[in-house]
């Protein structure tokens, strides 16, 4: 069997995922698409609007992703694709989250015994 990762580029960009949780998988079909692009794809595929436009939330604490992040996915997606973010404090927050969470996208470091024996 195979496990499909459901994270998208927007979530990955700011680390809004759980390592070995929702970010786990053998293939990431949405990994190079922003939230806005995923929504467009959903519409193109004819998915019900209530699913396509559902407010993103982790379902754990009653607040939305955007409330927790402090900016909208539309703002984030524009910054990812065009490099444009009109609010300097939001741009700094996005850059900070991206830098802090890049490790989530990297393979697990492995111990290399050869380097210790040289």
Protein language model features and the residues they cover:
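ATP/NTP-dependent adenylation/nucleotidyl-transfer catalytic domains that generate, transfer
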Residues: 1-2, 7-118
């Amino acid at each position: 069997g195979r496990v499909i990762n459901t994270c998208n580029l927007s979530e990955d960009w700011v680390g809004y995922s759980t390592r070995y949780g929702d970010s786990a998988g053998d293939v990431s079909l949405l990994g190079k698409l922003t939230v806005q692009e995923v929504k467009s794809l959903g519409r193109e595929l004819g998915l019900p609007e209530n699913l396509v436009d559902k407010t993103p939330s982790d379902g754990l604490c009653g607040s939305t992703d955007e409330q927790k992040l402090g900016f909208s996915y539309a703002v984030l997606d524009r910054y990812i694709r065009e490099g444009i973010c009109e609010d300097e404090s939001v741009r700094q927050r996005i850059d900070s989250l991206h830098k802090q969470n890049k490790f989530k996208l990297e393979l697990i470091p492995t111990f290399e015994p050869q380097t210790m024996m040289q």
